[in-house]
Design a protein with these regions (language model features):
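Histidine-/acidic-rich catalytic cores in large beta-rich domains
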Residues: 1-384
Length: 384
């Protein structure tokens, strides 16, 4: 779905009586800043990055920001021409969506606390209560495994490389590896083929992870249209869901249910699935269906109280929806940036934090501190 370049931006709609108070964190693609906005859509805090291109972040309870990013001096290789050999694995990963080189932790004022460099990490992360961090990483598969994997397509006269697969690693506070789960060993090369609209460069493309209190990991494998749960004790897959397309951001909600942003073919939806019986117990989609659509990136997070914050990533549209499927808050990204030579307003994901969240305790969240920035982007204009 397209949108007008003259569309309104900033806060476009708000029903204060039905929305959930809080502050929303997001990072526009191509920007050098991460932003925190209030319910009136105005910026109340920013973090500036000078040595990475920031990707996606989360606030920790101590007020630190944990952020993915890429080396600001990173050079992206050109795609190989017809009949040309593909670049080596370490260069090929730079061409993939969600690629990062860095996981950076900064304090409230942007001072570096810790930095983890791994040239094969991508997309997402999860910080455990014990301080360990879980991240997906890309690995190159063997000739034998590449031949076993079904599906996908190749372009005319394209020389295909070995497939890229996924592993999930856990590192401690000193960034020493303490665990590794090989997704490519858990998936079935025949029963979990590459989707037919995906090029045969990657098998799984893990783009989202979440961990419950027991330690079970739920992950999304976008290129297979799969969401799966890895058992904490056995490291085996104990549940697999196959009724989405190009999905993102699976999260644990409620009593063990899984919430998923299902990107879809011509319209997107947010669903809550019961893993015990695969029943979709809640669903939100556009009306008409194509009114809500993001073909890639995007996410949805459950807010305390039951509402859901949705990030329609491609368009840079954030909105809050109730359990009765009513949109009660909407904010559209006014920041236009350049990503790989193209203008964009997209946002990978967003999170809402309640006013009493520990990370916000004692913080100055007065939007007047950013008065000029808010006025410059018309963020100080109330929604009609």
């Amino acid at each position: 779905m397209g949108w007008s370049v003259n569309r309104p931006t900033g806060l476009t709609y708000h029903r204060a009586g039905l929305s959930t108070k809080g502050y929303t964190l997001f990072t526009p693609h191509g920007d050098q800043k991460t932003y925190l906005i209030g319910m009136d859509g105005q910026i109340v805090h920013t973090w500036m990055f000078d040595h990475i291109r920031p990707g996606y972040g989360r606030l920790l309870k101590n007020g630190h920001l944990l952020m993915t990013g890429s080396d600001i001096n990173l050079k992206f290789p050109e795609p190989p021409g017809q009949g040309k050999s593909p670049p080596p694995f370490e260069e090929r990963v730079k061409m993939l969506g969600g690629y990062h080189t860095t996981l950076l932790e900064v304090d409230w004022d942007g001072n570096k606390i810790a930095e983890y460099d791994n040239r094969f990490q991508h997309h997402d992360f999860f910080r455990r209560e014990n301080g360990n961090t879980i991240v997906p990483v890309w690995v190159e598969l063997s000739d034998e495994m590449t031949k076993k994997v079904r599906g996908g397509y190749k372009e005319y006269r394209e020389r295909l490389p070995n497939l890229i697969g996924d592993e999930i690693i856990e590192v401690n506070a000193d960034f020493e590896e303490v665990d590794r789960i090989r997704i490519w060993e858990l998936m079935d090369p025949v029963k979990d083929p590459i989707s037919r609209d995906v090029k045969r460069w990657e098998w799984t493309h893990v783009n989202g992870i979440d961990v419950n209190e027991r330690g079970d990991i739920v992950f999304s494998a976008r290129h297979n249209d799969r969401v799966a749960i890895i058992d904490a004790e056995t490291h085996d897959i104990r549940w697999k869901y196959t009724k989405t397309h190009g999905q993102h951001n699976p999260t644990w909600v409620g009593d063990g249910n899984i919430q998923i942003f299902d990107n879809g073919h011509a319209g997107s939806r947010v669903i809550e699935v019961n893993p015990e019986n695969d029943e979709v117990v809640w669903e939100f989609h556009g009306s008409p269906y194509p009114q809500f659509f993001s073909g890639h990136i995007s996410g949805a997070s459950r807010i305390p109280g039951g509402n859901v914050l949705v990030c329609e990533g491609t368009s840079g549209r954030l909105f809050e929806v109730t359990r009765n499927k009513e949109i009660v808050w909407e904010w559209i990204n006014p920041f236009v940036n350049m990503t790989r030579g193209n203008p964009t307003t997209s946002i990978y994901r967003a999170h809402r934090y309640s006013p009493d969240h520990p990370a916000l305790a004692g913080r100055d969240l007065d939007p007047e501190r950013y008065g000029n920035l808010n006025r410059l982007n018309n963020l100080d204009t109330p929604a009609s």
